């Protein structure tokens, strides 16, 4: 599977000084080690890895061979983007009748780095949060997400991971999610929010800047609407929709995101659900979405 293909991949280098980048396999292993050491005594599963955007090449000796004569050993590959998740199933809680497991997610995208330069710190994204076992939706809260982790070697990466795990407050995060289940909205309010989310994307930039960010695409907003009608776990057509279910409609729609925008949108789903929940209780910041 993906585990094998990232081990057999070549490692891109910085072209000005030929210095190695930290490859995907080293990224996964480093975070796996950090998780096992931080959560010692818990069951820490092996990473589940996804890769995309394959980049193929040939070794120099095979440059002049016709394609049909290439041996496997003549070919090189690497993947521009990789993501993985590591579950810790012994740390779990039930929210809104759904079992949530602690989960760590990492994302790496070479397309967001300048490989044409000399070696500079490399960009990684790392999150710790809870994964909904019913649907595998990922729940991420601000203090569990580093969207701009820049490190030069695996030692720094390991240290940054431990720091993130240490700063994360699972009890606070769970409390926040449990609160969502206590508020509901009518179909009319839901339709209003969906409409406003669609309008949001067409607003002039200045107007948009004055509002909280909303990162879901048009297609994703449509799938939130579809899931509201059809989803067996979180659909609420014909009845009140509680905010925990609304939140899961958002995180569910985010599953169609490319690897490199997935975590930002996961966090944004939390911001939207918590913000709209507060607006329903009279808070001003997300008021525009419900008016």
Predicted regions and their residues:
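Short, small-residue-biased leader/transition segments that mark boundaries at the very start
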Residues: 1-6
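Acidic, low-complexity, intrinsically disordered interaction modules
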Residues: 7-17
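Amphipathic alpha-helical segments
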Residues: 17-45
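A short acidic/basic microdomain associated with nuclease active sites
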Residues: 38-76, 80-83
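Intrinsically disordered, low-complexity regions enriched in serine/threonine
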Residues: 67-291
